[in-house]
Amino acid sequence: VNTSEIADRFEIADTLYRYARAVDTKDWDLWRSVFTADATVDYSSAPAGRSGSRDEIAAWLEESFAFVTVSQHFITNIEYSFEGDRAQVRAMFYNPMQFVGMTELSTCGGNYHHSMVRTETGWRSERLHEESLWFVNSPLAQDD
C-alpha cells in the first residue's frame, strides 16, 4: 500500500462518514454531495425500500425520514479495491433508530456496496447498493 492509496482510503472513509451524518441529520443536500449527479442508489433490500436516481432517492428519504425521530448510522469494516480512479467499497453498517409512535428502539444492519469514482472534488459514489441483512422491531411489523 502506497501513500497515495492511504490518502484515498481516508478520503473514501470520510465520504462514507459524511453519508452517515447526512442521513442522521436529515441533510439531504449533504447526502446528495456524496454521489455523482448521475448516481443510482438501491435500497430495495430494506423493508419497503426503493431504488432509483440520486435525486429520486433523496426525495424518498426526505419523505420516509419524517417518521424517524432519531437515527445513528455506524459505518465500519471498510474494504477497498482500487482500479485507477475507481474503487469498489464494501462497508458494514449498524443503525439504531426511533420511529414516530413507537416506544422501543428499532435496529438494522448490513453492508453498503459503493462503486466510487475520483472526481475533481474528491471521491464520489456513482452506485450504492445497500445489502440489508437484518431488521429488529420494524415499524412495518406493527401493521400486522
Question: How should each PLM-predicted stretch be described?
Answer:
Residues 1-37:
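Short, low-complexity N-terminal intrinsically disordered segments enriched in polar/charged residues
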